[in-house]
Each structure stands twice: as C-alpha cells, then as structure tokens.
A protein has these predicted regions:
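Active-site groove signature of glycoside hydrolases
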Residues: 94-96, 136-153, 162-195, 229-230
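Active-site-adjacent substrate/metal-binding segments within catalytic domains
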Residues: 5-135
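Extracellular glycoside hydrolase catalytic/binding regions
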Residues: 161-162, 177-179, 183-317
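Aromatic/hydrophobic pocket-lining residues that form the small-molecule binding cavity
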Residues: 70, 74, 119-126, 159-163, ...
Length: 317
C-alpha cells in the first residue's frame, strides 16, 4: 500500500518525507523550521451512541445528527487548512468535550467497544481523514483515550486491547503520517482506570512504541492538562513532549514551561509540542503562540466553538 506522507523526528525537529517542516521559513524573526503547527479538531469522527443526548447534535437544515456528514465536511475543509500552512490536526478516537468545558459527559463517543475492540463505523470515518491527510502532506496526532469516555471500558485489559488494536490498525493500513497522543490530559482527575493516570501512563506510551508491523512503529507521547509539566517517567519514554497551554494566562509562562521541560534530567533533544491552547491575542506582540514559537516549541490552536453548525470547531454539528 503506497502512502505519500511520512513523519519522522530528527533530534528536536519534525520531518515530513525526509525534509524538515517549513524548511527555511521564519515567522516574525523566529525559526519555525522543524515545528508542527497544529489545530485540535478532535471531533472528526464523532458520533453519539446515547439516544438521550444524540439529538443535541442535530443539523439545523435536516433536524438530524449525521456522523458521516460530519466527517465528510471535515475532510472537505482539510485542503483549506493546508493551504493556510497548517501541517497537523489532532483527531480523537474518543473525541473531546462536544460542549466545550461542560463537566458531566453523558454522551457515548468512542471508536472502541467496552471490551477494547474497534468499532468499524468509527474506523471507516477515521480512514477517510487519514487518507486525505496523507494526500495533503499533513500529520494527524491521533489521541487514543479521553477522560470523558474511559469509564465505559470494562477493565484495564480492555484498555490494553484497545491500544494494541488502534496501533495495529494504523500500522497495518500503512499510514506513515500518524503520531500518538496516547492519553489526553492524563492528570485531569476524571480518569477511572489507574493505567490512564500519571503514575502509570508511561506504561501505555512504552507499549504503543513496542507495537511493530513491517519493521515500523508509531511515534508516541501523552499530554497533560494546561500548565502542567509532564512527569520524568513520561518524558523518558516519549518520542516528543506534549504540553497544553489552556489556563495559562501569561505568555511568559508558556516559555517557562518549555524551559522547565528542557532542564529535566530525563529530557534529551526531541520536539516539544503544545497541541492544545485556547488563548489567542494574535494581534498582540505577546501571546501564547508567539511565546511557544520563540521558545522553539510547536503550538496548537484550540477553539471549543459553539453547537451552532457555523462556529463548531470541536463542538458538533
């Protein structure tokens, strides 16, 4: 199976098809070569299997929710994102919060059964996104587990099975443009299984890295909540360091987070990547994005949006 896009890491730079990203490019005097500028678009394969909440996502023109339409329109928009310089998107196998920062999450949105098997309909929608990203030369950061859905796994063995199945599916389908955010914000105190929490999450990152097919494996890391610094155990096993800027009001703190990671004894030359930050202020000289770039860290846009079909971002429809 011939694929067009292959992501690699060379020291602290991301490479696509053997060349550093944004080769030779600077932005406002700062080097962006090797960075992976990205946007959190986690609801690309969203569906809601809870009949009590499914109607929340109905389209204004049809009065019904349609997960295939959601993915189809997502894929149709991807070339526009790429034309504007976006090289990476975050897509979730268990989505994210479809109502922004709502605390309870009664919806059922997961590419896994409670036993950890893959749900074919979700995976076919994921296939269409990965195919388009491969065609466009884009990298997909695939988030495997999300704290709004982990309670539906029957036990820890189901989580291990889910991770194994996800990694094998990506590898067996030949995708070279996927990197893993194994657990989204592992230190958020809503996870119910210990292996998804900070003290043990490094086990999952290591497990993902050990799954091979055809001599290939996936690059992997895991994210922590906004303002948090990853544990040394996680940094030591990760291919790249994931951090979040949500809740970080002072752009100077963004640079401090990057420096703190680089000073950790477990750190070695590898990319540092924000893949979630809901602060903008792009018109100002100082903002979180520029602080990240000036510290030579990739930055990721997060806009929760509204459930109005016009300003959705990660809030369907």
């Amino acid at each position: 199976m011939e694929r067009r896009t292959r992501v690699e890491i060379v020291r602290d730079e991301f490479y696509i098809n053997g060349k550093p990203t944004y080769q030779g490019v600077t932005y406002k005097g700062a080097k962006i070569q090797g960075l992976l500028l990205n946007s959190r678009m986690v609801q690309g394969i969203f569906d809601d299997l809870n009949p009590e909440t499914r109607e929340l996502w109905k389209y204004p023109d049809t009065g019904k929710w349609d997960p295939d339409r959601n993915t189809r329109e997502f894929v149709e928009a991807m070339p526009v994102w790429r034309e504007h310089g976006l090289l990476s998107i975050v897509v979730g196998m268990q989505g994210g919060n479809p109502q922004g920062y709502r605390t309870d999450q009664p919806w059922r949105n997961s590419a896994f059964t409670p036993e950890g098997e893959l749900v074919p309909e979700f995976m076919e929608r994921l296939r269409s996104i990965l195919d388009k990203a491969d065609e466009l030369g884009m990298v997909v950061q695939l988030n495997v587990f999300y704290f709004g859905q982990d309670e539906h796994f029957i036990d820890e063995s189901a989580i291990l099975r889910a991770l194994d199945n996800a990694c094998r599916w990506v590898l067996e389908n030949g995708y070279g443009n996927v990197i893993l955010d194994v657990v989204n914000e592992t230190d958020v105190p809503h996870y119910e299984h210990e292996i998804l929490m900070p003290a043990r999450v490094h086990e999952l990152v290591q497990r993902a890295k050990e799954i091979e097919y055809g001599g290939r494996r996936l690059l992997a890391g895991t994210s922590f909540k906004g303002g948090s610094i990853p544990t040394g155990q996680v940094v030591s096993v990760s291919d790249f360091v994931l951090i979040h800027g949500n809740g970080v009001e002072d752009p100077n703190q963004i640079a401090e987070m990057v420096e703190t990671v680089r000073l950790m004894p477990e750190y070695r030359p590898m990319p540092i990547l924000f893949n979630e930050d809901d602060h903008f202020d792009f018109e100002k000289d100082k903002n979180n994005m520029m602080s990240a770039i000036n510290a030579y860290a990739s930055w990721g846009f997060l806009e929760c949006g509204d459930n109005n079909y016009r300003d959705g971002y990660q809030s369907p429809p």
